[in-house]
Amino acid sequence: MLSRQTMSNWVLRVAEDWLKPVYEELHGRLLQRQVLHADETTLQVLKLEGRTARSKCYMWLYRTSGDAEHPIVLYEYQPTRKAENAAAFLEGFSGWLHADGYAGYHRLPENIRVVGCWAHLRRKFDEAVNALPKEQRVGCAALEGLEYCNALFGIEQELAGLPPEERYEQRCLLYTSPSP
């Protein structure tokens, strides 16, 4: 029977020898794109040198946009949420970064233009509407924003099955035409 340590060493060796080069190749290809998405979420780590048990760490996600012929999604573990983590990962990238409202993204170099996420904005409108008493919801600005986001998401859902070029053309027609 193999020991747990032996099996663990095998997994680490395979990751280092075989998976790391694949990850690095995908990372290089990701940085060549014009539009990326980024997000980070907490991850509880039971034991980490120099930190208390059950410390909060972060899993960062970076991915290509929906128009990519070959989508790439990469995860990066980091012990902190410092903006330097994103800056280091995105070194060499120049383009649009689609992200939530985390201030760290706005400290990235000028060649990375941060744009907001409609899903996060919609959630904030929804939270604002639900925080109001029901009688104050009708006609409030938060409800107007929520309805706008819902309409926008409806259009995007209709366009989802189209090839990227056709989606772009349809968006140009829909979003630049005057409102009725």
Where in the sequence are the language-model features?
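DNA-recognition alpha helix
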Residues: 1
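A conserved active-site cap/scaffold subdomain adjacent to cofactor or substrate pockets
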Residues: 140-156
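Conserved small/polar residues in nucleotide/adenosyl-binding loops
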Residues: 175-180
